């Protein structure tokens, strides 16, 4: 249960141990996450990064990405063996949005290329996550930075997808 910045509901994302089964599979933690897109559960064990399909079509040019968050770190980052990674560093969450172009070869981005794909047109990466006191919310307000020209014709044809990602652990996709 959690409170909300506004209204009655809020998403609470928590990184948890996956227990013995997850550890045996090399996936000792599961980071709580919320994203726009789909998840292919049938391929999650064999290809966890490929199972997450980020983004949905967008018919407008995004300018800003803003909202509110509250964050309490889960502690120090651990590796797939459950031991702290050296040098020791504190876990931190992620908040970002990616606008990318779809084409005949790229219908979606996944966990392996969400921040590296050549199809990325613009990014809004919030890098200022800080731990809060546990009450109250912090504002994030990020301007989209365009890396490629925006094409209104592609917009009309819904050739742009928008991915929005919130993750409790920055390296959660890699089970760290």
Model-derived segments and spans:
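Aromatic (Trp/Tyr/Phe) and Gly/Pro-enriched flexible surface segments
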Residues: 1-66, 88-176
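Short amphipathic, basic-aromatic surface patches that mediate peripheral association
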Residues: 69-86
């Amino acid at each position: 249960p959690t409170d909300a910045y506004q209204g009655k509901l809020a998403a609470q994302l928590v990184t948890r141990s996956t227990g013995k089964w997850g550890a045996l599979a090399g996936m000792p933690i599961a980071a709580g996450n919320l994203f726009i897109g789909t998840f292919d559960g049938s391929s999650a064990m064999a290809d966890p990064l490929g199972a997450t399909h980020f983004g949905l079509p967008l018919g407008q040019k995004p300018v800003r990405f803003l909202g509110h968050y509250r964050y309490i770190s889960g502690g120090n980052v651990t590796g797939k063996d459950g031991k702290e990674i050296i040098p020791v560093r504190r876990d931190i969450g992620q908040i970002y949005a990616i606008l990318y172009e779809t084409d005949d070869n790229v219908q979606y981005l996944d966990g392996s290329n969400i921040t590296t794909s050549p199809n990325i047109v613009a990014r809004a990466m919030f890098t200022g996550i800080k731990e809060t006191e546990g009450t109250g919310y912090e504002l994030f307000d990020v301007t989209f930075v365009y890396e490629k020209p925006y094409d209104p014709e592609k917009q009309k044809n819904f050739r742009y997808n928008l991915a929005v990602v919130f993750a409790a652990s920055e390296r959660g996709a890699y089970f760290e």
